[in-house]
Amino acid sequence: MRVKDTLNLGKTKFKMRGNLPVNEQKREDIWAENKIYEQRQKLNEGKPSFVLHDGPPYANGNIHMGHAMNKISKDIIVRYKSMSGFRSPFVPGWDTHGLPIEQQLTKEGYDRKKMSTADFRKLCHEYALKQVDKQRTDFKRLGISAEWDHPYLTLNPEFEAQEIRTFGRMAELGLIYRGKKPVFWSWSSESAMAEAEVEYHDVTSPSAFYAEKVNDGKGVLDENTYFVVWTTTPWTIPASEGITIDAGFDYSVVQPAGEDRKFVIATDRLNYAAEQFGWEDVQTLQVIRGRELDRIKAIHPFDNDRELVVMLGDFVTLDSGTGLVHTAPGFGEDDFRVGKEYGLDIFVPVDDRGYMTAEAGPDFEGVFYEDANAIALDKLKASNALLKQMDYVHSYPFDWRTKKPIIFRATPQWFASVDKIRDQILEAIEDVEFLPDWGQKRLHNMIRDRGDWVISRQRVWGVPLPIFYAEDGTPILEKETINHVADLFEKNGSDIWFQWEAKDLLPEGYSNEHSPNGEFTKENDIMDVWFDSGSSHQGVLAQRDYLEYPADLVLEGSDQYRGWFNSSLITSVAVSGKAPYKKVISQGFTLDGKGHKMSKSLGNTIVPDEINKKMGAEIIRLWVSSIDSSSDVRVSQENFVKASESYKKIRNTVRYLLANTSDFDPKENGVDYNELRPEDRYMLVQFNELISKIRTSYDNYDFIDIYKTLLNYIITDLSAFYLDFAKDVVYIEPENSLKRRSMQTVFYKILVGLTKLITPILPHTAEEIWEYLREPEEFVQLAEMPEVANYTDGADLLSKWQSIKELRSHVLKALEEARDSKMIGKSMEAKATLYLDESTKQLVDTLGVDLRLILIVSQLEVKALSEAPKDAAIFDDQLAVEITPAQGEVCERCRMTKTDVGSDEHFATLCASCAQIVTENYPEAITEGFEEK
């Protein structure tokens, strides 16, 4: 027999390395086979509900790190709620219509203009489902627990039907109308766009200052006077119909030296203009208030047959330009508004693909709009109207899918009126909680300032607008027809809109006074995809009886304030008068390590699959819990290396606890709270505080606080304190001694509680740990979160032990100094003499603390503070410490230096305490003796 055979050296099959990339997938298979998600839902039947509604990601390509961050965040919340007394189902969704899928098929060689709409839509449908399967696999690999077999897809007939009914309700309320006004127009997509589909980039455009000659000065200006206007879109000059000024600004009529012409410029911009044009000795002839110039006429700079009218508008500024704005009502929202006020025609000489039409004039016809800039500038020069041309850097809208610039273009479109229900929507926002709280103001301002929603799209892969036209062109948006279409879609899918005649899509026997011959046609446009996802509160929440409407929570990227948060809010308030969610959490974007947007072309992407294969999904999940995702998040390999190191600390700590409870059965060996040793009772109370803090952080969605609290507890309270001296009990003391079982009781309670607490973040690891615990639930996901206990002496214990730990830190410092001076090697070679004041000594005595144990020294002596020698290390007014080498020899078993080593005749290398333990528990050692080293 060897001495080590008499020690209770912990053993466990729980490996130091998790081999996560391999073992996680095996565990996910086990979850699927055992239907863990379904079991959890069944357990929670009848409990209060908590519904997190999944904003649908777009079904195109593998998931990126932003997807991972978002879905893992949701999973953490849902798992926690499910283990905390809530019925919390999670239905994942996908946005499956839209331009990117059409574009992808075009890349694969399909030309939608050379095939039937029905055939092209079939290809889109098949492609979308493949993408859903691909992303579902990616999400499941991250350990996301969800209703994977019954997700919601915006292409599902039942969803499309509810979307049509949502549209119908809005039409019934008079919120749907057809109008011609400028909308974001993507020539690269050949379709109108919503604000949520637009992104902005800085671009350099040719800007021009040019003069427009007064034609009818109304007795205010003579005909040798020119308005100086400014534009950053010279290509729109062919569509110019007026000049907009501000009624309250002062405008100066000036004449520079050497010029026959007189010019009108906003007085506050005169110095700037003179500098730009190189004017000298500028003479001010007249100062006129803007309102006096109203309806004065000017001549178009390169079309003498066209008159321009001076108009008063509220959008003119003095920040740039001249205070006079070139106005083309067909190409700008403000221009359109002021043009309508003045009764101007809406002139739009650009086609769907961005090419100028014949209306623009022979020099422009067939020219791409960007190329028309140069022609317009040349014509200004030729007519001596151009005063200055310069490059201008400004923010410009782009199609977020094609990454091409877009234009404002007035076209006939279908709109959802926001204006009619704006006040209701703003009121609904007041009832919603936001995290971060600035989200409320952001969404409020967006709704306050946004225009009506253009919901029609000139594409084919989407939900058709359920609108019919009578023989005289009257649009038909009746409750009867729309609901009938919804019923047809629910039964047959929306493809029938493109396969059936209009008469077959109308209710049997339907008639309309505008179609005396019974002839009808149908709308060709489809709905904006934001109307698809924006109807999910009706298509999912209100449809599935185990969900709730409104949802308790939505959690998406901050771009969704203008996207899904926005569109779903509008439709929900329209159909039900309330917001579709009670709380909104927004997250920032994932950027590369340098703060740049991730892009395949830049080669700076890190994708979840790469980390999964290299380190495991648990590392991504732990990383998600370690970041503040309320703002933009930088992602680098170093982030995951750091998360991996933290994971190892958690795993190794758990492994130590498992190894040292392998012979512990809580039912047979557990020690009651009142019988626990002082240090163990304190650790249990402290762990109870940890449970309280972490659960509060979960409730507040404060993942980073959970991460920090957990790591600090493991490193500081367990590893550096409790487990630091634990081996002197669990290894050394008799197997069934109260001292050892007391500590094991706390070890086990910490293990069980800790495993439950980390389950939402590290479910794979938690399940692996759970297999080694003697708990009734087969899977930890089917257990409940640890409850916060009420220890009557808890607060008192925490306060007193804080003093003990401060004392310990002072002694450890003195031991460190003794090591540095070579007085001792390990702390077990030391004797510590503590000189305590009366209150501290009384505290130690009251608690019954084994100070020698927690200080990890071989010998300890406690004396009055008044006896402290001058060379003792003094800490405040309560403690002095003297470290000296311990007297005696080192016990081969407990490694303590003692004066009674060899006092037992049978065990020459053991101290008296170890000799007694061996004699009582290993009597064979007396006759056999120990093997020599």
Curated annotation (Swiss-Prot):
Presence of the UniProt keyword ATP-binding in the record: yes
Domain description: IleRS has two distinct active sites: one for aminoacylation and one for editing. The misactivated valine is translocated from the active site to the editing site, which sterically excludes the correctly activated isoleucine. The single editing site contains two valyl binding pockets, one specific for each substrate (Val-AMP or Val-tRNA(Ile)).
Function text: Catalyzes the attachment of isoleucine to tRNA(Ile). As IleRS can inadvertently accommodate and process structurally similar amino acids such as valine, to avoid such errors it has two additional distinct tRNA(Ile)-dependent editing activities. One activity is designated as 'pretransfer' editing and involves the hydrolysis of activated Val-AMP. The other activity is designated 'posttransfer' editing and involves deacylation of mischarged Val-tRNA(Ile).
InterPro entries in the cross-refs: aa-tRNA-synth_I_CS (IPR001412), aa-tRNA-synth_Ia (IPR002300), Anticodon_Ile_BEm (IPR033708), Ile-tRNA-ligase (IPR002301), Ile-tRNA-ligase_type1 (IPR023585), Ile-tRNA_ligase (IPR050081), M/V/L/I-tRNA-synth_anticd-bd (IPR013155), Rossmann-like_a/b/a_fold (IPR014729)
Cofactor requirements of the protein: Zn(2+)
UniProt-listed CDD domains: Anticodon_Ia_Ile_BEm (cd07960), IleRS_core (cd00818)
Sites where the protein binds ATP: 600
KW Ubl conjugation (keyword) present: no
Catalytic activity: tRNA(Ile) + L-isoleucine + ATP = L-isoleucyl-tRNA(Ile) + AMP + diphosphate
Family: Belongs to the class-I aminoacyl-tRNA synthetase family. IleS type 1 subfamily.
Molecular functions per Gene Ontology: aminoacyl-tRNA deacylase activity; ATP binding; isoleucine-tRNA ligase activity; tRNA binding; zinc ion binding
Gene name in the database record: ileS
NCBIfam families, per the entry: ileS
Entries under SUPFAM superfamilies matching the protein: Anticodon-binding domain of a subclass of class I aminoacyl-tRNA synthetases, Nucleotidylyl transferase, ValRS/IleRS/LeuRS editing domain
Subunit structure comment from the entry: Monomer.
Motif ('HIGH' region): 57-67
CC per GO annotation: cytosol
Protein name per Swiss-Prot or TrEMBL: Isoleucine--tRNA ligase
